[in-house]
Amino acid sequence: MKHRTLLTCMCGLILFGSCKDQPTQNEQPLEVMTFNIRLDAPSDSANNWKYRKDNVCKMIAYYQPDLLGMQEVCHNQMEDLKLGLPQYTALGVGRDDGKEAGEYCPVFFKTDRFTLVEHGNFSLSEQPETIGVRGWDASYNRITTWAI
């Protein structure tokens, strides 16, 4: 009896948990993408940023994400991405000084779909409000960019 009750409850949870609301006409899917573009390292020779930047922008334009998070973005790459992706608002700062030094972890969003309410950055360390601080045995400073 105990097993039958448990089985009935589990079947009910599975049945009702798998139900899906019907989408309304106003609903739009949210396309999200993350992309580690690799920093601009002169030692990359044939894979140098100057050879990759157009293809990076083309790939993003092809997938057209509404929200885009990136990693390993240097300041010059951030400037190139802003120029190559004019339909996006770009947010982020360098991890070493909170301005331009060090890699960025920027957030890009489609300007025509979202309205920026608030944004900021914090360090992944024991002192999150101080940019440029290493934490928890990290080899490099780590930073996060957020937006509402």
Locate each region found by the language model.
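Repetitive helical segments and hydrophobic/amphipathic motifs
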Residues: 11-13
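Bacterial N-terminal signal peptides that target proteins for export
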Residues: 1-7
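Structured beta-strand-rich core segments of catalytic domains in phosphoester-bond hydrolases
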Residues: 67-148
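N-terminal, active-site-proximal structural segment of metallo-dependent hydrolase catalytic domains
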Residues: 6, 16-84, 95-103, 121
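Short alpha-helical segments used as structural interaction elements across diverse proteins
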Residues: 1, 49-50, 139
